[in-house]
Swiss-Prot record:
This is Probable E3 ubiquitin ligase complex SCF subunit sconB. Keywords: Repeat, Transcription, Transcription regulation, Ubl conjugation pathway, WD repeat. Component of the SCF(sconB) E3 ubiquitin ligase complex involved in the regulation of sulfur metabolite repression, probably by mediating the inactivation or degradation of the metR transcription factor. Pathway: Protein modification; protein ubiquitination. The keyword DNA damage does not apply. Component of the SCF(sconB) E3 ubiquitin ligase complex.
Amino acid sequence: MADRPEPSSTQQSLVVPDAGVSANADSNRSLPRKDTDNTTQTLEELARQNVAPFLAKYQPRQYAPLRSQVSAPSERHMVNAGYCYRHQPDSKCSRRQADEQSMTQLQSELNLLPQSDQQGIAHVWSLFSAAPAKQRTLMLQGILAQSCFPQLSYISASVRELIRIDFLAALPPELSFKILRYLDTASLCRAAQVSPRWRALADDDVVWHRMCEQHIRRKCNKCGWGLPLLDRKRLREAKREIELRATNWGNNKPAVGSSEAAMVESCSTVQPPASGKRTLESDEEAAALAKRHCASSPQSPEVDESYFKTRYRPWKEVYRDRFVVGMNWKHKRCSIKVFKGHRDSVMCLQFEDNILMTGSYDATVKIWDTDTGEELRTLKGHVAGVRCLQFDDTKLITGSLDRSIRVWNWRTGECISKYNGHAEAVIALHFDCTLLASASVDRTVKIWNFKDKSTFVLPHPQGVNAVKIDSVSRTVLTACDDGAARLWDLDTKTCIRVFHNHIGAVQQVIALPREIELENHLADCENDHVGTSSQGGDNILSTLSPLLEATSPSHPNSPFGSSFDQDQDRIESPRYILTSGVDTTIRLWETSTGRCLRTFFGHLEGIWALSADTLRIASGGMDRMVKIWDPRIPTGQDTYEGHSAAVNCIGLSDSRFITGGDDYQVRMYDFRA
């Protein structure tokens, strides 16, 4: 061996171990027993001579620290560049940690071998550990080429488990969020059970905010499931924070911990402005936190930090609460509360949060607390029945059979002003911003402009039963006793569309929210005979009434007339509207074409009350029943009974609806319980 020429370092690392093993085998067969110790010592020295340069070349920091300080940058780059992401020293993902139990067993088996075999195996491991990716591949190819079938079978069984990687731990948080946002609710909950790291990512606000946006107040196009409305203010304020976290603003990274506190903290490592957070939903929770904060020591910064962090609800909790409410709607699980106090039929109502206002034929307006059921105040002033009302944070406006309109400060009970402009009873009113529209039996709709103190009248052929203003598009919807609903342009004071298909008086007309999506569900709907023509879309308008043809816009760009084209900033009217009438039907219309897209059948008598949001339609009528509809499925409906007389009015929110009837009662169906 001494006379053998000295090979290069690379050749030594690849050839000499096999030569050493071969020499060792030959020595066991040919050398005398007395020379065994000398031969073993010679092989060990030769192995050290061959392995040392290899280790010094590819692991300079450990085996050649002085050389590593003066090594060329290109060589250092070549050494590190070949590693995969698991073994890249500069990567945030460290080497895959060996299983402690497996290593213990491996070490025990190694200790059973002779000392020379242990050293040889250790040299092989050291060579492979120090080798770059290319050399490792060559080593593995050589090992596989010399392995028999039992050994290959063992390798196959072992590799099957080893190649399973935690890809979410390997990826940056923003990419992990991108992947998780494609999962459904059930899959996200299962992902949170994989590991603490997965739980921190799967429970993060970035993921669940997307889930809330996709399902709350709308039907998901993928799963067909929709959840009740979330508070708009909280949704808007949190959006900026979620966008920052989704793009890894501030290099946030979820922390992995064993406790729940660590998980919550990992979701709040980025601290945007306070406006981007979600406040507590009740004053009781805030009071409880205030007591806990006051009771704690002011010297402890941890208590202060915990105090502020617990004020924000994770989006997963918001989704969970909305999901519970949605399931209650689906299975008709609700609590019922009855408000008694009126001495005549309840004709109108409105509620916001815990405030409910009702108007009755007993000429009073009552204000209720829906949480306690307590009657807070009774407003008196009208000399005949109150037929319509609407309120906001500061004022209440009522219309009465005494032909007057009154404006109240409902917090104090004071009547601020009174308007007399109709010749007969005021049946409906609606205000939006600075405009008020009132409808009357005198066949007119009067528009009151509080800003410039002006008024004008929209004439109708018969009495008007309902009116709705859309200030964004500057249009008005009206329902008339002549069996038609109309869309008016407030700028030109003209009727731009007539919806004429009811048999009998139209009692209600409302616009569906602009964000509602019905295109996919209406693609195969069967339209009424007035809606479409068998000859195609060009003949749609030919089947409508002469009044519609006379008032339909001729401008080629906008279906609503030239006034919309002249003002580029003007938004078109809502795309869909609903009407109900004494013919027991509810009809869905497309405003741009005047088509009746769908008819809802189910009531046995005339429909007096109608309300809707993006998820459902609520209606009540002379048959004493309340029906809840899905605007996408005309045949599906839930029926609620409880009134002993006709249902005159209804109010709908994300988690409850309230009705008033001729039995003098107001009934609240609450799905939050």
